[in-house]
Structures are given as C-alpha cells and as structure tokens.
C-alpha cells in the first residue's frame, strides 16, 4: 500500500514538473468529470487539522472573491487550470 502511494505521488510530481514547463491549458470541468478529476488530483492529500485554519474574522478579510466562489464557479462555468483544481484539495 505504501509503495503504491509513493509511486502515485512520484508520478504526480513528475507530471506537475513536466506540465509546469509548458503553458498550462485552461479547460472546463463539469459534473462527473469535475468530481473524478478532483478525486484523482486530491488522492493522498491530507486534510488540514482545525488548528491550521485561521480564525474566521481573519480569513473573511483576506479571502476576497475566492471565498464567495466555489470550484463549479471557477472550473465549470469558465475554464480553469489544474493548479486551480489543486487549490481545492485538502
């Protein structure tokens, strides 16, 4: 199990390194395609504990428009990059 996880993470890192050398293409992700892509990208990404979150009053001040929008707004209604999708992991 651990070996599989390490291999998967290695493939992800190599893929991200390779893709960062080229200009990333923005695409639309909707419905099951969005859910499956997020599941594939976020596999193995641990959720942050509550202690790592900033207090509510602080986060609302700095979230800006990102705090009011969701992954569907950013990646289904308009094209987004894999980096944007990765920002929703964890």
Curated annotation (Swiss-Prot):
Molecular-function GO terms, alphabetical: growth factor activity; hormone activity
Subcellular location: Secreted
Record-linked Pfam families: Insulin
One Gene Ontology cellular component: extracellular space
Signal peptide: 1-20
Protein family per UniProt: Belongs to the insulin family.
Role description: Brain peptide responsible for activation of prothoracic glands to produce ecdysone in insects.
Protein name: Bombyxin B-12
Organism annotation: Bombyx mori
């Amino acid at each position: 199990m651990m070996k599989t996880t390490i291999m998967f993470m290695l493939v992800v890192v190599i893929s991200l390194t390779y893709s960062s050398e080229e200009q990333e293409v923005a695409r639309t992700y909707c419905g099951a395609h969005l859910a499956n892509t997020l599941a594939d990208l976020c596999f193995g990404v641990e959720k942050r504990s509550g202690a790592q979150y900033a207090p509510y009053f602080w986060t609302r001040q700095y979230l800006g428009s990102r705090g009011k929008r969701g992954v569907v707004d950013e990646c289904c209604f308009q094209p987004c990059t894999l980096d944007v999708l990765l920002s929703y992991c964890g």
